[in-house]
Amino acid sequence: MTLDNYFSELTDPEIVIKHSGLLQLSGLAGPEIIELLGLWSTIPTERRREIVDRMTELVEDNLDLDFASVFRACLRDKDDQVRAKAARGLEDSDDRTIIRPLIDLLLKDDSLEVRASAAVSLGKFAVMAQDGKVLKRDGERIRVALMEVIDRDDESLETRRRAIESVASFDSPQVEQIIKEAYDDGNPELKQSAIYAMGQSSDSAWMPIVIQETQSSDPAIRYEAATACGNLGEEDTVPHVIALLNDDDSLVQLASVRALGAIGGSLSKRALQQCLLMGDDAVEEAAKNALQEIEFDADPMGFSAES
């Protein structure tokens, strides 16, 4: 099927949207994206939502797909759900041209869902800014925008907590204080975000708190603590993460497996090999991926496989 024919199908609400068809929207550029935009407003709202939702699912399963041009165009959609889904779809994008549109949504959009999604997607660029992979002025714009919404008294909790998670990559006493205040706030959701932020900061000074929270009675907190251990990458956390492999909550178990893959080391590797024998398909699959991550980190060029 030609791209023109598929565009026509998208506008027809009687035709079922299939993942196989949406693959044709990957990598659109130039005249192709202009043509799609010309038809976009004729597509019913519910169908536009479904299209963007399906593309987001596809990207999560296959990082080789590139719907960034479509997602970026949808940031201007008149429907707030489409804008929010599009902003979230850009979470893993490193296209620097979307920094300003995301900042505009974060600071100015009327929808709290859109603002929160924009805050999440700016997190990737915050990391890039700290690594010197974006212009300094863009990094500063990101930091200032995130700090602004965190400081707003009338901002939604969801937007503030996502902004805290994203701003954590910036190394400064002010950011450290924000994380501490969120942790001590008493709100369970803010505490979850604070623990995630501790890991995102890559500051080992947070390690004692993160380790302590692996024993929390709240599974959501244990999940974030496991994730934070993985992001901190400190081998001292490994025994505490291993203890979570037998957690009653399956999501905590999976977070622990991923964390061990991120931390690496011989102890993590042995624990993950034991996970292959647990008889849980999800845990076994996650453990295989984690072991591959450890092997790649140890031998990124694949030299050992050639010897």
Regions found by a protein language model. Give the residues of each.
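Eukaryotic low-complexity, mixed-charge intrinsically disordered interaction/regulatory segments enriched
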Residues: N5-Y6, E14-L22, I33
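Alpha-solenoid HEAT/ARM repeat scaffold
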Residues: V16-H19, R49, D53, S69, ...
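Long, ordered, amphipathic alpha-helical scaffolds
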Residues: G230, S250-A305
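Amphipathic alpha-helical scaffolding segments comprising HEAT/armadillo-like alpha-solenoid repeats
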Residues: M1-F7, L28-W40, D61-R76, D95-K108, ...
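Residue-level signature of alpha-solenoid helical repeat scaffolds
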Residues: D53, R88, D104, V120, ...
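HEAT-repeat alpha-solenoid elements in large eukaryotic scaffold proteins
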Residues: F7-I15, S41, T45-D53, S117-M128
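Alpha-helix N-cap/helix-start positions at coil->helix boundaries
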Residues: I15-V16, T45-R49, D80-Q81, R96, ...
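Structural signature of alpha-helical solenoid repeat scaffolds
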Residues: T56, E91, G123-V127, A168, ...
